[in-house]
């Protein structure tokens, strides 16, 4: 999933000779943390809402260029790259440039989150399991083999943390018995930190047990 599928042009970036008040109008209207600043076709940087609020409303935006933050994203970057840049720059907007450094539009964090929410990892039903293993032992192929040995199908996995000398992995999978998968991981030296699943059979047995209890109460 690439950035170029989510480029927006909902507003035109202000010109560098326009006043700070105009930049703030755009920021407030679209709920932005930053606004991109250009001098002609040359990208200068991103001015934060706080920088504009501290400046005089009649100052020209170009006068604030020394306070601009230099972050952009390429049109061929992935949405995961975008998430990292949003986080690193405490921003909800990323200017998108092509390989010639020309401005194509911008990327909004809400659009990226919406895009990621359509991934099979999110949409497909399944169990969520967080496992932990030493960094030396971490192997995607071994994790896949353990899951497959229990007739489980992995929908997706990713590394979520590095506590001390360990690696923590979040897995989403489809399995007949999540308990069997969990036990096998533990036999191979993994720690199962967390697991969540919805078991229809378990729900059925629970309902029948509750009905029996009600009958016995009568």
Whereabouts are the PLM-identified features?
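Bateman/CBS regulatory modules and CBS-like beta-alpha motifs in cytosolic regions of diverse proteins
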Residues: 1-26, 37-39, 43-46, 57-85, ...
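Short hydrophobic beta-strand motif reused across regulatory alpha/beta modules
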Residues: 33, 45-52, 104-112
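Short acidic/polar active-site loop segments enriched in Thr and Asp
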Residues: 33, 92, 153
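Regulatory loop-to-helix N-cap segments in sensory/regulatory domains
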Residues: 54-56, 116
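Cytosolic regulatory modules rich in charged/polar residues
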Residues: 71, 99, 103-111, 115-218
């Amino acid at each position: 999933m690439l950035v170029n599928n989510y480029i927006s042009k909902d507003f035109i970036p202000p010109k560098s000779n326009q006043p700070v008040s105009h930049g703030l109008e755009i920021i407030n209207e679209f709920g932005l943390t930053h606004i991109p600043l250009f001098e002609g076709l040359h990208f200068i940087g991103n001015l934060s809402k706080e920088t504009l609020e501290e400046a005089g409303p009649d100052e020209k935006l170009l006068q604030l260029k020394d306070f601009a933050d230099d972050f952009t994203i390429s049109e061929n970057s992935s949405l995961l790259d975008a998430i990292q840049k949003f986080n690193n720059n405490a921003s909800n907007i990323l200017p998108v440039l092509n390989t010639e450094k020309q401005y194509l539009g911008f990327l909004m964090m809400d659009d990226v989150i919406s895009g990621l929410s359509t991934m099979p990892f999110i949409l497909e039903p399944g169990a969520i399991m967080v496992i932990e293993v030493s960094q030396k032992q971490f192997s995607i192929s071994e994790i896949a083999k353990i899951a497959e040995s229990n007739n489980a199908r992995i929908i997706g996995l990713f590394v979520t943390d590095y506590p001390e000398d360990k690696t923590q992995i979040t897995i989403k999978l489809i399995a007949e018995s999540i308990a069997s998968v969990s036990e096998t991981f533990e036999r191979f030296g993994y720690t199962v930190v967390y697991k969540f699943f919805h078991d229809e059979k378990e729900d059925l047995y629970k309902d029948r047990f509750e009905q029996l209890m009600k009958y016995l109460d009568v």
